[in-house]
């Protein structure tokens, strides 16, 4: 439980949701003059963005909302502008921005927050990023301890878990697809990272591709398998590249 003195908090995972929580905590701690020490455990190279908005992924991966509907107001005093003013070159209001560009912005927001906290003396929020995963949790006498890289960290008053989209047990349909791929020697590939999918697809010319699901990710996959391999869309329809 949090008290009036310095409270230690651990965050497992970050990404956009975790970044939003950190920014809110920074604002709250400054307004209420409460001190927090926060350890963030996330092995991802761009923890502010997370894998779904990887700044290094293919620009063929697009958001499903146009630029005009993206409202990402930064905290006051953060020293960074909103996404529309930050991104260069500017993106038209009716265009759907590449997810990697939004990921780069989210990572810049995190770096601005880290720089802001490290550059202040007597700040209310102290942030430490540990680029590692957490293997185990335990609670002793009301406090939490985390095992990461063979070392126990803690004690922590509170734990915030932001797992994103962790691996889960395959459902019946995916299990059937896995069995089919194993017996037919077919390739069962994930949609992301899109660059990895694109590299694998260079060997699929003339083959039939089945896409599991039909949502945002499926449109990314379709772009990767068409324009990503050199195909073009024109007034007369689609012209494949032959790859």
State what each model feature region is.
Residues 110-124, 228-243:
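Dinucleotide-binding/catalytic capping subdomain of oxidoreductase cores
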Residues 41-104, 108:
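Glycine-rich active-site loop/strand segments that organize a redox cofactor
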Residues 7, 20, 24-28, 94, ...:
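N-terminal extension/subdomain marker
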């Amino acid at each position: 439980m949090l008290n009036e003195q310095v409270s230690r908090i651990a965050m497992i995972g970050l990404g956009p949701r975790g970044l939003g929580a950190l920014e809110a905590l920074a604002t709250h701690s400054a307004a209420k003059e409460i001190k927090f020490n926060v350890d963030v455990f996330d092995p991802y190279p761009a923890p502010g963005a997370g894998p779904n908005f990887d700044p290094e992924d293919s620009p063929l991966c697009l958001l499903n909302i146009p630029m005009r509907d993206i409202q990402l107001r930064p905290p006051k005093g953060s020293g960074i502008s909103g996404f529309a003013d930050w991104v260069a070159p500017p993106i038209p209001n009716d265009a759907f921005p590449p997810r990697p560009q939004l990921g780069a912005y989210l990572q810049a927001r995190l770096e601005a927050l880290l720089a802001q906290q490290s550059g202040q003396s007597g700040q209310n929020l102290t942030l430490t990023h540990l680029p590692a995963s957490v293997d185990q949790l335990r609670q002793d006498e009301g406090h939490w301890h985390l095992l990461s890289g063979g070392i126990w960290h803690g004690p922590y008053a509170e734990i915030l878990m932001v797992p994103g989209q962790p691996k889960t047990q395959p459902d019946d349909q995916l299990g059937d697809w896995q069995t089919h791929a194993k017996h037919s020697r077919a390739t069962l590939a994930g949609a992301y990272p899109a660059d990895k999918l694109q590299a694998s697809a260079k060997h699929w010319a003339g083959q039939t591709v089945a896409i599991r699901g039909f949502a945002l990710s499926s449109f990314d996959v379709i772009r990767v398998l068409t324009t990503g391999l050199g195909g073009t869309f024109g007034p007369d329809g689609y012209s494949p590249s032959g790859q």
